[in-house]
């Protein structure tokens, strides 16, 4: 399973009572987990914004996730995905969203996300 950054943030917040957290946990419990190297920057940004030293959450990601490198092919595919999603009416679909989805597709993984911009993508599980 490939995790979107908003799902990673939910994991860091770790509220066992949350139905959303329980759903995420059920989906990823025994699956190998993947993220894009790009998301390390997003998590660092989230950490700094929330006055958390980014070293700990990034260390956790490095220990528990398979980190997919950013390649030229993924970048090009990400921009193509952004273009296609915007043409489908997803006006807020970003290049970052496209790169994350392209990274998941590059290794034949399903993306798990809370981001409504992905609702029209066939290979995304919305939580």
Model-derived regions: residue spans:
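Active-site regions of enzymes building and remodeling cell-envelope glycoconjugates
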Residues: 65-66, 122-127
